[in-house]
């Protein structure tokens, strides 16, 4: 006789929690929220309709109902809060959570939502029923709480060996699957007629990671609980996050990457996810194509809404209404794509930071290696063997080649090539040489440009006679000046002002044997006239007392003679009246050393530098 009153929210709630939905449909959820706010008894009727949907045996319906209740709690104010905290709704939640046939994910979702609502209703003591129900559920189902973190135990060699075996087994299975991929389409065609049950929970294919599972066979895991790091190096995540597995670090801890961050996480907080199949990848690609295909409709809707008059009734305009509903349907997919590509953006950002750091480290190492090259003899010309007329040292201008092989003496100054005025500076300003330049390397300090007037040398410098005053010899005197000058300096260490006895020994100086020194002393005791006369085979070299009265010749410094036949005529006169000898005797091939014997006059000894 009396019929039950029809609930106006049954259809709207059933539509928002349809079991055939692949995800939460926010269009239908917002419609329920708007309807609850528009009606006086909307909150009570909506909660009554949701209690009916919680009794449904499909896990998807139960999950969608919990999401609808959470959306109402966040958008509809105190009215819906009072109904959600009522005894009828909390008892329905406890019955569903304590049912042994309820899926584990649904139980976890109930506990999670009740915790959120307890915190949301904490300011109002009238809603204490929700807190009581939450504490009761925690007591009756302790396994729903986030587990305690396992200890960090080092991985043993046996664990490493087991991980390697699992990896090899996974590779073998992958190769076997690829080998049997050809008959696979026929099997799929034969089984396509069988109906497929799509009412299972979305996480039915996922399973918790067992303690002995290695990271070699798992690439992705999903978080079951929120995890807050308590030590440095741990990865923070929220429930539902998908973590990319990198490697095993401890016995029950893996290393993973999430939103650009890398760290370790406990295995009892996550569940293993299988790798996406070809069908799943195609489904994701189709979803992205649907979202991008609605871009034109969204732009068209914005254009119509911006150009229409404010007096236009939007509800009467069928075009605007159709565009609105078609674009609103892509909102859940759009939110999912935003989360997906946000995670990829974080991963690429982290990869870019690692690449930049690696590039900076490489460049710093490269600059450090280039800043310390191999040691080289900068400024020191390569010394040719004694007695061999080698090429000119590095840093000295190359003298002109001699055209006549029978010509013994150096050409006149006008025959030599003067260096250009803008020629680069040579190494060092006042260098002391361990041996004189060869015949093809004139001293640049004594070679002024052609045609330049004679310039008086500086007082602190030693006056250098022209090379025309040198007579070729085949004997090198023993030098007592042991310390060679450093390159690139402007101070000349005079052996006269600083005798060898007052200077520290040069570590690189060559010690002359005693027999050779005795031989040199015997040669120095010979008569003076014998040293002044040219040798029948090897002419002597040096100055004579009569050279001091001769007028100076041209100031150019021609190349020194090398090993050539004996002279056919007398050498040119000696220029200048300087009493200071040159520290650069000529070096020629052949024979042993023969020192110059000084004359018994008041003139200073030219060979004083070599004693």
UniProtKB/Swiss-Prot annotation:
Please note every region of biased composition (Pro residues): 558-575
Indicate the principal place this protein occupies in or around the cell.
membrane
One cellular-component annotation, GO: endosome membrane
One Gene Ontology term of the molecular function aspect: ubiquitin binding
Compositional bias (Low complexity): 182-195, 388-397, 452-472, 509-534
Basic and acidic residues bias: start-end ranges? 151-163
Record's bilayer topology term: Peripheral membrane protein
Q: Which key words are in the record? A: Endosome, Membrane, Protein transport, SH3 domain, Transport
Localization annotation:
Endosome membrane
Q: Where does the record place the UIM domain?
A: 162-181
Subunit details: Component of the ESCRT-0 complex composed of HSE1 and VPS27.
Family stated for the protein in its record: Belongs to the STAM family.
Q: What is this protein called?
A: Class E vacuolar protein-sorting machinery protein hse1
Organism per entry: Aspergillus niger (strain ATCC MYA-4892 / CBS 513.88 / FGSC A1513)
Name of the coding gene: hse1
């Amino acid at each position: 006789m009396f019929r039950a009153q029809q609930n106006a929210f049954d259809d709207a709630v059933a539509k928002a929690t349809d079991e055939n939905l692949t995800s939460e449909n926010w269009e239908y959820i917002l419609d329920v929220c708007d309807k609850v706010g528009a009606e006086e008894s909307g909150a009570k009727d909506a909660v009554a309709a949701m209690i009916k949907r919680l009794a449904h045996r499909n896990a998807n319906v139960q999950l969608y109902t919990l999401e609808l209740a959470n959306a109402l709690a966040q958008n509809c104010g105190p009215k819906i809060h009072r109904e959600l905290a009522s005894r009828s709704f909390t008892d329905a939640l406890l019955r569903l959570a304590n049912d042994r046939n309820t899926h584990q994910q649904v139980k976890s979702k109930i506990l999670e939502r009740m915790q959120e609502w307890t915190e949301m209703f904490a300011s109002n003591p009238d809603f204490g029923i929700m807190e009581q129900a939450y504490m009761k559920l925690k007591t009756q189902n302790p396994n729903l709480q986030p587990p305690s973190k396992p200890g960090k135990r080092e991985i043993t060699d046996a664990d490493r060996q087991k991980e390697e075996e699992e990896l090899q087994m996974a590779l073998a299975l992958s190769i076997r699957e690829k080998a049997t991929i050809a008959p696979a389409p026929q099997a799929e065609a034969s089984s396509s007629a069988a109906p497929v049950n799509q009412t299972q929970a979305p996480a039915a294919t996922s399973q918790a990671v067992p303690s002995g599972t290695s990271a070699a066979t798992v690439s992705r895991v999903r978080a079951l609980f929120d995890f807050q790091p308590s030590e440095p190096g741990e990865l923070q995540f929220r429930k539902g996050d998908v973590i990319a597995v990198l490697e095993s670090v401890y016995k029950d801890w893996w290393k993973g990457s999430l939103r650009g961050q890398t760290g370790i996480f406990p295995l009892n907080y996550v569940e293993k996810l299988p790798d996406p199949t070809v069908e799943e990848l195609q489904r994701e690609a189709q979803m992205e194509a649907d979202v991008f295909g609605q871009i034109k409709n969204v732009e068209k809707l914005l254009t119509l809404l911006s150009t229409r008059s404010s007096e236009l009734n939007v509800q009467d305009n069928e075009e605007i209404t159709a565009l609105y509903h078609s674009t609103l349907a892509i909102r859940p997919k759009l939110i999912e794509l935003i989360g997906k590509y946000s995670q990829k953006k974080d991963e690429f950002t982290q990869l870019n930071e690692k690449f930049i750091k690696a590039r900076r480290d490489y460049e710093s190492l490269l600059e450090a290696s280039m800043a310390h090259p191999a040691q080289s003899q900068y400024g020191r010309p390569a010394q040719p063997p004694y007695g061999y007329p080698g090429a000119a040292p590095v840093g000295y201008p190359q003298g002109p080649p001699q055209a006549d092989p029978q010509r013994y003496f150096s050409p006149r100054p006008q025959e030599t090539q003067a260096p250009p005025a803008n020629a680069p500076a040579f190494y060092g300003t006042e260098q002391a040489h361990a041996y004189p330049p060869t015949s093809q390397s004139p001293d640049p300090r004594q070679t002024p440009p052609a045609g330049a007037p004679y310039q008086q040398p500086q007082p602190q410098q030693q006056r250098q006679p022209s090379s025309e005053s040198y007579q070729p010899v085949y004997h090198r005197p023993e030098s007592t000046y042991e310390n060679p000058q450093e390159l690139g300096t402007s101070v000349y260490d005079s052996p006269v002002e600083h005798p060898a006895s007052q200077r520290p020994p040069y570590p690189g100086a060559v010690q002359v044997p005693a027999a050779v020194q005795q031989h040199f002393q015997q040669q120095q005791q010979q008569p003076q006239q014998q040293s002044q006369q040219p040798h029948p085979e090897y002419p002597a070299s040096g100055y004579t007392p009569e050279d001091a009265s001769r007028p100076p010749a041209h100031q150019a410094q021609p190349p020194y003679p090398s090993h050539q036949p004996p002279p056919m005529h007398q050498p040119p006169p000696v220029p200048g009246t300087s009493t200071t000898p040159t520290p650069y005797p000529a070096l020629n091939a052949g024979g042993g050393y023969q020192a110059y014997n000084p004359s018994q006059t008041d003139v200073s000894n030219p060979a004083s530098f070599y004693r």
